[in-house]
């Protein structure tokens, strides 16, 4: 087949081209907010519209377009859906063996207040998982835990998506930062430093914001000491680790420091009033569990599934383990790489999105052993043995997990199909170039480019791979620091995670809200836009006023 070159301005006017390119996204917003369609229905129609735009407007060859849709769908199944299946399976093992009652009791013994439980589980534990694994696992695990603690499913999912803003940029051992460095040629350590001078401000704001969502102004007044301890310790550790150690460990270090500081603080301080969701939508929790006399050994045993999960995911994430499966590694043959027919290197990305015409690779990687989902599955198998779960119960639990997640898995596949047709057709790059045409105001809109990238792909890493080079080029054209705008792509991207169709589908799957994706999207969308504007203001101030903050 001939090499097809992407054309980012088929209409001859970048604004008209971007309007047509935005049709699938506008439909997706409309389908969830106004039509209130189920997630899998909205995603299916969005793929159909994106495919039509790619074929009719961008003149993408039919074979290339269909191949990108199929590639995206299978990428949604592996590795994304695999992570969710394994994570939900671990949670179900904990529930089925009766250990979750003890976990619930241990958290209630620290604090019965659900606002503070959100800080411990949703923020601290979630940030740790984000640093170790990323790619949807933190939200799936923490949201399921919070539902078990009595949170309303919608609130558990929505709050976990919002609070996940703080750690995403340094997620999965700093991969988003490392990728940004690779595609721009800028030192990834410096990018991490710059992100570490933007995100700490957002961390504090996000935690106060979460308290306001849960309990209004009263919630802020009653919990501010705990928020300052949790958010302040996290922000300081995030700044110090990103600026003096590197981009790989800020989430791990910050989350552990925050968890330790908050837990010690709550031994000395509790809010004057205990807050709990009283609506019927929340599962009822027996408050006497907080006073049940479980021994330290029983509590430790109950937490073992999640300790195993933490250990295996961390092991799978460290560079020496990853190197085994990289090209030239001892176990590289265990990774099956399949070039996608009719797509691999048959589409060319063109300037100014890249510096020169570049063939777009499309290789499906079936890393059956080194995938994060497999690490979580190992944790599940260890838990089954450790907790002496009957094999028949384990098999039935895994079967019920697959059955419950069948529809969400399809949704995730269609969401990734939309992301891939957007990327390979050039649709996403058209939207990016339109934003880059805003001149000196681009410092404000720069984070929106990262936001758009994460919305489309569900990943800050993928957003940087798509748009970081464009950010650097735009920065040079308007005379501001390319380091600043590449960092803004990363920082802005974290605010798009909470409304990414992929994240919405994962969160709904984890808490049993299948078919309620529109409710969750409406819950998070306004917060996402507000946070992105905040990052835009911070970036603009750093570009023109606070230039001393740039490394």
Curated annotation (Swiss-Prot):
<keyword id="KW-0769">Symport</keyword>
<feature type="transmembrane region" description="Helical">
    <location>
        <begin position="366"/>
        <end position="386"/>
    </location>
</feature>
<protein>
    <recommendedName>
        <fullName>L-lactate permease</fullName>
    </recommendedName>
</protein>
<feature type="transmembrane region" description="Helical">
    <location>
        <begin position="438"/>
        <end position="458"/>
    </location>
</feature>
<keyword id="KW-0997">Cell inner membrane</keyword>
<feature type="transmembrane region" description="Helical">
    <location>
        <begin position="131"/>
        <end position="151"/>
    </location>
</feature>
<keyword id="KW-0813">Transport</keyword>
<dbReference type="GO" id="GO:0015295">
    <property type="term" value="F:solute:proton symporter activity"/>
</dbReference>
<feature type="transmembrane region" description="Helical">
    <location>
        <begin position="405"/>
        <end position="425"/>
    </location>
</feature>
<feature type="transmembrane region" description="Helical">
    <location>
        <begin position="530"/>
        <end position="550"/>
    </location>
</feature>
<dbReference type="GO" id="GO:0005886">
    <property type="term" value="C:plasma membrane"/>
</dbReference>
<feature type="transmembrane region" description="Helical">
    <location>
        <begin position="494"/>
        <end position="514"/>
    </location>
</feature>
<keyword id="KW-1003">Cell membrane</keyword>
<dbReference type="GO" id="GO:0015129">
    <property type="term" value="F:lactate transmembrane transporter activity"/>
</dbReference>
<feature type="transmembrane region" description="Helical">
    <location>
        <begin position="159"/>
        <end position="179"/>
    </location>
</feature>
<feature type="transmembrane region" description="Helical">
    <location>
        <begin position="13"/>
        <end position="33"/>
    </location>
</feature>
<feature type="transmembrane region" description="Helical">
    <location>
        <begin position="37"/>
        <end position="57"/>
    </location>
</feature>
<dbReference type="Pfam" id="PF02652">
    <property type="entry name" value="Lactate_perm"/>
</dbReference>
<feature type="transmembrane region" description="Helical">
    <location>
        <begin position="194"/>
        <end position="214"/>
    </location>
</feature>
<keyword id="KW-1133">Transmembrane helix</keyword>
<keyword id="KW-0472">Membrane</keyword>
<comment type="similarity">
    <text>Belongs to the lactate permease family.</text>
</comment>
<feature type="transmembrane region" description="Helical">
    <location>
        <begin position="244"/>
        <end position="264"/>
    </location>
</feature>
<feature type="transmembrane region" description="Helical">
    <location>
        <begin position="70"/>
        <end position="90"/>
    </location>
</feature>
<comment type="function">
    <text>Uptake of L-lactate across the membrane. Can also transport D-lactate and glycolate. Seems to be driven by a proton motive force.</text>
</comment>
<dbReference type="InterPro" id="IPR003804">
    <property type="entry name" value="Lactate_perm"/>
</dbReference>
<keyword id="KW-0812">Transmembrane</keyword>
